[in-house]
Regions:
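Histidine-centered catalytic/metal-binding microenvironments
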Residues: 445-560
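Charged, amphipathic alpha-helical linkers/stalks
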Residues: 391, 403-463
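Boundary/entry segment of secreted carbohydrate-active catalytic domains
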Residues: 98-114, 122, 141
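Catalytic-core regions of glycoside hydrolase
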Residues: 81-85, 110, 136, 143, ...
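Contiguous, structured surface segment used for ligand recognition
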Residues: 1-100
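Short, hydrophobic/amphipathic alpha-helical patches that form generic packing surfaces
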Residues: 16-20, 67-81, 395-402, 438, ...
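Acidic/histidine-rich, surface-exposed loop or edge segments in extracytoplasmic proteins
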Residues: 1-8, 107-111, 144
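Catalytic domains of carbohydrate-active enzymes, especially glycoside hydrolases
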Residues: 120-144
Length: 560
C-alpha cells in the first residue's frame, strides 16, 4: 500500500501514525496512493476533540489541539477496515468530543509487577497505545509502603521509574499526577507516632506504619515525607496530586474519628499547603476509598457526610473527589448533591483470583458495565487501577465509557477486538471474555466453576487462534487472552478431579495453588510465557507473589 502523510508540522503525531501502520502492514511511504493529512484547528470546538473526514484515497484528521489529533489518529486506526495489505478509514459523524474531562490510568509501580520491571521502551509504546485509546493523564505513586528511608536503593529505583513514566507521558502532551497517602509512614516510623488501628476493622491495607497527625511532632514528620515526595518531580511538573484515606491510611483516635470525614480532610489540607508551594497550578483530588464501609448500627459512620461538609467550607480548593470501592458503587454520592466533580477508580486488577493476572487476561465486561451504568450520571471520568498489562481490555472498556457514557461494552470491545485481533473473530472473542468472567465471578464468590463454560472458552480460543494472522496470533494481547482460556480449563479440571468437595478446595481454587499445575508441562510452558511477558523472571517468589503466575517452584526459565 502506498501512503503519504502530510504532517503540517505535527511530527509526533505523524511519527506515531506511521509506526502504528508499519506494525500492521507493509507500506511504501511518500508514494502516490492514500494521503493522510494531519491538522489542528482550535476553532472547531472543545479541547481534545477531533474529526475524521475524507473518502477513497484522501483523508484528513483534524484535532482541536495536539491531544485531539492523537485521539483522531487512534480512532482512524481502531475503526478502519484492515486487511493483510491495506486499510480503509472510516469518517466520523462530525466532531467527536470526550464526555469526561478526567481520563487517567494509574500505573502502580510496585510489587515487582510489569510497570515495576518492564524496560522503559515497553512503557513508551504502551503509553502511546493508552493515549490512542483516549486517556489524557498517567498517575504513579512513590510507594512509601515499601521504603525504610529515602536513602536506600529502592527509593531511587522507584523515583527513577516514576520519573521515566512521567517524562514519557509529558512528551506526548499528557498530564501526570501522583498519590500521597495522607498519614502513611515509612517502615521505620517511630512507634510514638503510630495511629490508632481501630479504624481498620473490616478493612484491608494496614502495614502497621500509619501515623496519627494529632500526636505532637507527627504532623511535622508527615510533612517531611510529603515534601520529599513532591520534590522529586519539580523539573517535570505535576498536574495533579491526590490524597488517599485508607489502604494505606487511617486513624481511629477520638481526635481523628471518623477518619474519612474528620482527620483525613484536615490532613489533606496540610498536604495541599505543601503542594501549592511547589506546584501552584496543580489540581487537587480527594479520594474516598473505603469510606463508610465499616458500619455502626443503625447507620454508616458518617465519613461522606463529614467530608461533604468540609468540601462546602474549608476545602473549596478541591478540584475532584474520587469515589469508588472494591464492590458496587458507593451510594452516598449517588443520593446527594454533587459538591465537587466526581471521578471513579475502577478496580480492574485485583478483583477475585490470585495471583493478579497470574492466569493471563482478566476481562470482566459485564461487571464493569453494571457498575458504570449505576454511577455514570454523576461522573466526570476516572482512573482505572492497573497492576499490569493483563487488564488492558478493561482499560479500553473504561476509556470508551469516558468518551461516550452510553456506549455498551460490546460496542467498545468489539472495535478493540477487530483492531487488535481480527474483525472476523469479534463475536467469538467477546464470548470468550464473557465465559472467562462467568467462572471468575463464580469462583471469587465461593462457588464451583461452570465446567461447560471453561471447556467452551478454551475451544473458542483454540479456534480463534487458527484464524489470526501471524502479527495478531503472536501479539501479547492475544497471547494473554488465549493463555487465560487454556489455563482456566486446566485449573478447573484439576480441581474437578482432585479437590472438589474437600475442605478449603474453593479457597485453594480462588488462590490458584501452585501445585494445581505443577505436573502439567503444557501449563508450565504457558505460565512461563506469562512470566516472560510480565518480566517476572528470576525473581524470588515471595517478593512478587501478588502478580507472579503460579509456576512450579516460583522460578522461570529465561529460554523457551
Amino acid at each position: 500500500m502506498n501512503i503519504k502523510i502530510v504532517s503540517n508540522g505535527h511530527t509526533k503525531q505523524a511519527d506515531l501514525l506511521k509506526r502504528s501502520i508499519d506494525e500492521r502492514i507493509s507500506a511504501t511511504w511518500d508514494a502516490d496512493g492514500m494521503t493522510l493529512i494531519l491538522d489542528i484547528n482550535s476553532d472547531l470546538g472543545p479541547i481534545e476533540s477531533y474529526i475524521i473526514e475524507g473518502e477513497k484515497n484522501e483523508w484528513k484528521i483534524t484535532g482541536t489541539d495536539g491531544l485531539g489529533l492523537f485521539y483522531g489518529i487512534g480512532k482512524l486506526l481502531h475503526s478502519a477496515k484492515w486487511t493483510a495489505e491495506a486499510f480503509d478509514p472510516v469518517a466520523t459523524d462530525g466532531l467527536v468530543s470526550p464526555a469526561c474531562s478526567f481520563r487517567a490510568t494509574y500505573y502502580t509501580v510496585h510489587f515487582h509487577n510489569w510497570y515495576h520491571e518492564a524496560p522503559v521502551e515497553e512503557l513508551v509504546r504502551y503509553t502511546e497505545e493508552v493515549l490512542l485509546y483516549g486517556y489524557n493523564a498517567i498517575f504513579c505513586i512513590l510507594p512509601v509502603i515499601n521504603l525504610n528511608d529515602f536513602e536506600e536503593e529502592a527509593f531511587y529505583m522507584f523515583r527513577d521509574k516514576t520519573r521515566a513514566i512521567y517524562k514519557i507521558a509529558k512528551d506526548l502532551g499528557m498530564k501526570v499526577g501522583t498519590i500521597i497517602n495522607a498519614n502513611q509512614g515509612l517502615k521505620t516510623t517511630p512507634d510514638k507516632f503510630l495511629a490508632d488501628p481501630s479504624c481498620y476493622k473490616d478493612r484491608t491495607g494496614n502495614n502497621g506504619k500509619n501515623i496519627c497527625p494529632e500526636i505532637d511532632g507527627a504532623l511535622d514528620y508527615l510533612r517531611s515525607l510529603w515534601v520529599k515526595i513532591l520534590e522529586q518531580y519539580t523539573d517535570i511538573g505535576l498536574d495533579y496530586v491526590m490524597t488517599w484515606p485508607y489502604d494505606e491510611g487511617g486513624c481511629g483516635c477520638p481526635k481523628c474519628y471518623p477518619w474519612g470525614g474528620n482527620g483525613f480532610p484536615r490532613a489533606s489540607n496540610e498536604v495541599h499547603k505543601e503542594v501549592i508551594k511547589l506546584y501552584p497550578d496543580a489540581k487537587f483530588i480527594l479520594a474516598t476509598w473505603y469510606f463508610d464501609e465499616v458500619y455502626v448500627e443503625p447507620r454508616p459512620i458518617g465519613e461522606y457526610e463529614g467530608l461533604y461538609e468540609h468540601l462546602r467550607t474549608d476545602m473549596s480548593y478541591v478540584d475532584y473527589i474520587m469515589v469508588d470501592s472494591h464492590n458496587m458503587y458507593p451510594r452516598y454520592p449517588l443520593e446527594h448533591d454533587i459538591v465537587k466533580p466526581i471521578i471513579n477508580f475502577p478496580e480492574i486488577s485485583m478483583y477475585g483470583l490470585k495471583s493478579w493476572g497470574g492466569r493471563g487476561a482478566m476481562p470482566l465486561p459485564k461487571r464493569f458495565q453494571r457498575i458504570w451504568d449505576s454511577s455514570k450520571r454523576v461522573l466526570d471520568g476516572g482512573m482505572p487501577y492497573s497492576e499490569g498489562m493483563y487488564e488492558d481490555v478493561s482499560k479500553v472498556q473504561f476509556a470508551g465509557y469516558y468518551w461516550d457514557p452510553d456506549k455498551n461494552y460490546r460496542e467498545i470491545l468489539g472495535e478493540y477486538i477487530a483492531y487488535e485481533f481480527s474483525d472476523k473473530v469479534v463475536d467469538e472473542v467477546l464470548e470468550i471474555m464473557e465465559l472467562i468472567e462467568k467462572n471468575h465471578v463464580l469462583v471469587r464468590e465461593g462457588n464451583e466453576p461452570d465446567w461447560d463454560a471453561a471447556l467452551r472458552a478454551e475451544k473458542l480460543a483454540e479456534e480463534v487462534d487458527t484464524k489470526l494472522c501471524p502479527r495478531a496470533k503472536t501479539a501479547w494481547r492475544w497471547r494473554i487472552m488465549y493463555i487465560r482460556a487454556r489455563i482456566d480449563r486446566m485449573v478447573y479440571e484439576y480441581h474437578r478431579e482432585n479437590c472438589q468437595g474437600k475442605e478449603n478446595a474453593l479457597s485453594d481454587l480462588w488462590q490458584t495453588k501452585e501445585e494445581y499445575l505443577a505436573d502439567n508441562d503444557e501449563a508450565q510452558e504457558l505460565l512461563q510465557e506469562l512470566c516472560r511477558l510480565y518480566h517476572t523472571i528470576d525473581k524470588e517468589y515471595k517478593k512478587n507473589h501478588w502478580t507472579f503466575p503460579p509456576v512450579k517452584g516460583g522460578k522461570v526459565l529465561k529460554n523457551r
